[in-house]
UniProtKB/Swiss-Prot annotation:
The chain crosses the membrane at residues 3-23, 51-71, 85-105, 116-136, 137-157, 158-178. One of its GO terms (cellular component) is plasma membrane. PANTHER family: GLYCEROL-3-PHOSPHATE ACYLTRANSFERASE-RELATED, INNER MEMBRANE PROTEIN YGIH. Pathway: Lipid metabolism; phospholipid metabolism. It catalyses: an acyl phosphate + sn-glycerol 3-phosphate = a 1-acyl-sn-glycero-3-phosphate + phosphate. This is Glycerol-3-phosphate acyltransferase.
Length: 201
């Protein structure tokens, strides 16, 4: 029962869409109404407000980190261990993808997934982040960087810790993240994907 409560709390935390909240605070257009229509930091950046984009990125990453950090530090006292951590990791990620507070229309989960990985293990999160940065710098495609980082994340976890239930959670997040980028994959193949820094109206 405690595991379910932690997972439910994680889902609700994940359901807070910082792209929408931050945009409202800055009196910007709803990110679901322009560009890629994705409520995420990259699309908020297309508004031209870098501060709002950075706050969105930090907020989405922080909620993933917070949910996993809470269950890792307080879960054992309530009988919630590795299986619970894996469930919470998935729950907060699902909350971002399909948020109950925003009619189940959420983002693609890149920043939230990174927050989850950093909370699981700093080296795991750092390796995944470096992968994203290298690809983003080399090709200037945020989506391509996210896809490659997502593919490598389960391998990084496996190298660090071997096969366990949390690896399954990381793999599930990676698969969902790739799925959420289906349109981006099509655009990349067609040469129509927007590069970092461009303003797609």
């Amino acid at each position: 029962m405690n595991t379910v409560l932690f997972a439910l709390g994680a889902y609700l935390i994940g359901s807070i869409s910082f792209a929408v909240v931050v945009s409202k605070c800055f009196r910007l257009a709803d990110p679901r109404s322009y560009g890629s229509k994705n409520p995420g930091a990259t699309n908020v950046l297309r508004s031209g407000n870098k501060k709002a984009a950075i706050l969105t990125l930090l907020g989405d990453g922080a909620k993933g980190f917070l949910a996993v950090w809470l269950v890792k530090h307080f879960g054992p006292g309530y009988g919630v261990h590795e299986n619970g951590v894996a469930l919470v990791a998935i729950a907060v990620f699902l909350g971002h993808l399909w948020p109950v507070f925003f009619r189940f229309v959420g983002g693609k989960g890149v920043a939230t997934a990174l927050g989850v990985l950093l909370a699981l293990n700093g080296w795991l999160g750092l390796a995944t982040l470096v992968t994203w940065l290298v690809i983003a710098y080399a090709f200037r495609y945020s989506s391509l960087a996210a896809l490659i980082a997502a593919i490598f994340a389960p391998f990084y976890y496996g190298l660090l810790f071997g096969p366990d239930v949390i690896l399954l959670a990381v793999l599930a997040m990676s698969i969902l993240l790739v799925y959420r980028h289906s349109k981006n994959i099509g655009n990349l193949l067609a040469g129509k994907e927007s590069r970092l820094g461009s303003k797609k109206k």
